[in-house]
Every structure is written in C-alpha cells, then in structure tokens.
C-alpha cells in the first residue's frame, strides 16, 4: 500500500477508537498530525503485512518514519514516536480520571477493568512484548514456584547508549515514578510516556497515583506511587497504606520493596508500592507454626511455611494489624542474635534490618505478610549474607525484591540461549555452554541417569526452579532447619516482651 493509504487506515482506527471523541471533521487534522510525525517522503509502496490492528498500524508508521529518516532506527526513538501516535487515542488525564471514578462509584471492578483495558489498547502496557517472556511452574517442597525469563524489555543498542551519554542531563522528570512522567515525550536515556496515564487517589490525605506497569510480570501488575518525590521508608504508615490500598482496590494485593540496599528494589528514591491481581506462591503457603501475641488475641498469626522468614497476620481490624506490624518492625530493627548471624546494625549505627510487607484481603479479613530482611555482608558473602550466594549466581545474582520474595523468579534474558547450550551439554552434543554453568550441569548429569533430547528441556526447567528455591533459602534470615526455626521463635518471643 502507499504511505498515505497507511496513514489513512491508522486515522480511521483512531477516529473510531471507543475512548476518543473525534468526528469526521477531525480526520484531515489527524492525517496531517500523523504525516508530520512520520515525514512525507515519497510515495514508494510501504511493506506492511498483517496491518489490521491499531498497534500493527502504529508499528508500520514507525517503520515508515525510519524509512523517511524522520527518526533514527533506535529502540528509544521508535518508542518515542510510537507513544506519540498512540497518544492520539488516549484521553486526557482529566478525562481518564473522571471516567475511572465515575465507574468506581458504581462498581470498583468496572473502573479497574476500564483502566487496564485502556492501558493495553493504547500500547502503554506492552502486551506483544510481554508475550515473549518464558514462563513455567516448578513443583518444590514449598509449593509450585513461578519461573519467568524476562524477554519483554528490549536490549539497549550500543549506539543508543553512546548517543545518550552525549545528551545534557536535565533532571526532569526526577525519576521514572514521578507524576511528571505523564505525557512526557521521552529521550534516548528516558522512556517515552506520551500515552501514559495515572489515576489519582487519596491516601492518608495525600495525593497518590495508580498506574499499570508497561512491562508487567503478572496479571494487572500495578504501581501505586507517592505524588511527592520522597525516598522509600518502611514504617507504620507503610502498613496503614498497604491495608487501605487492598481495601480500595478490590482483588488486588499490595506490597512494598524493602527500603535498604541489597534487600530492596531497584528504585529506593521514590516511595511506591506494587500490586495486582495475582495469587503468588507465598500467598498460598500455609502457616507452619501458629503464634500468639500478647494483647492481640483478635489477630491470627503464624510463621509461614516458606523459604524466607515470613510472619503472617490476619484479622478484621486493619488498625490492630497495622499496630502489631509496626511493633514487629521496631523489634526487628533492634534485634540481634549472633548465634545465627543476625545483626541489627553496625557499631556506627548503619541499619541492617527491615521488612518486605505484602497485604491482601481474604473475604472481609485483612492479611499482611511480613518478610524479615537483613542486608549484612561478609568476606565470605560480599554481595550479601542473605542474598543469592556465589554458587547460584550463574542463574540469579540480582537483588531479591518484592516479586521474587513472593515466589516469582524474574530471570535475565541471557538464560534463554544459555539454557539451550546447557541442554546440548547434558545430551553430549556440540555446545557453547558458558563455563560458569559447568559445575551445576555436571551435578545435573550425576543426579539423572536417563537424559534425552525428549526430556532435557523439562529437566533443565525443573533444575532452574530448584536453584530459585535455593536463592530464596539464601535470602531467608532464619533458616528452615531446627536451629533456624528455634531462633525465629526466639525473635517472636522478643516481640511479646517490652
């Protein structure tokens, strides 16, 4: 088809998009806006196969802009232009917020469905890219763990990296979680957010934002962000906020990354939580040891049967749960037990202890899981005593954040090709297996006598799952053996004592 025909097809889709208010009188204007974005060029026929959906047409127009030398063939410039094109079907922030809260008054579930569907339809949530991820479950003694190899985020082009280094740093937006991102065009070193929308809501009389994650790791992966650019802090307000969010956003869990390096998430500079509609393995795990806290007979409590050190609190009164959780946090921040290598802080006062909290509703009951974290390092474990140890870092060496804590592994893209080479090695075929996988692969060979091309993929997937289980055990402060659990009980007794 001709370039102008492609533009017209896109405009037809735009003008009939359910959330737009365009009329026939707007079509010429829209045509010229798109023509300006992609460049006029000549009328050389455009190669555009299967361009039937709005997003397919957008991709074809981005390629047209590259062909017309309107933009460079760089992932960032493609994303920037793509977001500008999809902004044409995205209502203004005020309209999105009005629609969301009008629906919410009648049915909160319909409001969530509206915003989620819009965020997919306007290509803010990268549905096609997310579909590239590899995902499978692996049975373990803690239940099924969820394994994902993250292929959705494009690798950074070396040329793009080099160009980004030459750009002037503006300091705007302050970070990728600021409200300033809404509608921001993007740069080579900062993601395009022209088609990004944020729903505002009140949390403890403060303005917060609710959005979806563009590269979701699970169903309806959400981010709840503070309207102010302030550092992450885990305190009583955190527990109060999480419990309010799960009440306000039905069907969603809400959790926070820890607020210390090594055990925290990748962004510690902006207060935010994550949530979504997903039942994680940890949420399914039962209580292994019931607990009772003095003065809290109305709250069910216990140690969760999980590789990390988790205390679960359940009850009908959010304020009571919040208060007990805050007491546990305070005690943990000052608790040391040298017998099991637990140290609250250094001599200079540098803190080591915090909590990764996750809240959810169980019917009319509030539930919060408190995952104890310790970010000590040692000569033996320079990356962290309670961090993936060296012998499992060939699979996972990054921080164990909120999502991994709950039993969903987010593994790096390199593992797709690397595991294929491991499979060849296990089948005694010519291979280019990375040397750092050899010890692990040899152990797999020793443990399994009948490895064939027919079963090797499932076998390797299961072994990756076992490594992830070990990763979580490494991150657990009180180990699951008798000594570790006795030490855990000892800490819970401290909570009961002033």
UniProtKB/Swiss-Prot annotation:
The keyword Plastid does not apply. This is Galactose-1-phosphate uridylyltransferase. Disulfide bonds: none annotated. The keyword Zinc-finger does not apply. The gene is galT. Pathway: Carbohydrate metabolism; galactose metabolism. Keywords: Carbohydrate metabolism, Cytoplasm, Galactose metabolism, Nucleotidyltransferase, Transferase. It is found in: Cytoplasm. HAMAP family: GalP_UDP_trans (MF_00571). Belongs to the galactose-1-phosphate uridylyltransferase type 2 family. It catalyses: alpha-D-galactose 1-phosphate + UDP-alpha-D-glucose = alpha-D-glucose 1-phosphate + UDP-alpha-D-galactose. Its EC number is 2.7.7.12. GO terms for biological process: galactose metabolic process. GO terms for molecular function: UDP-glucose:hexose-1-phosphate uridylyltransferase activity. GO terms for cellular component: cytoplasm. InterPro entries: GalP_uridyl_Trfase_II, GalP_uridyl_Trfase_II_CS, GalP_Utransf_C, GalP_Utransf_N. Pfam families: GalP_UDP_tr_C (PF02744), GalP_UDP_transf (PF01087).
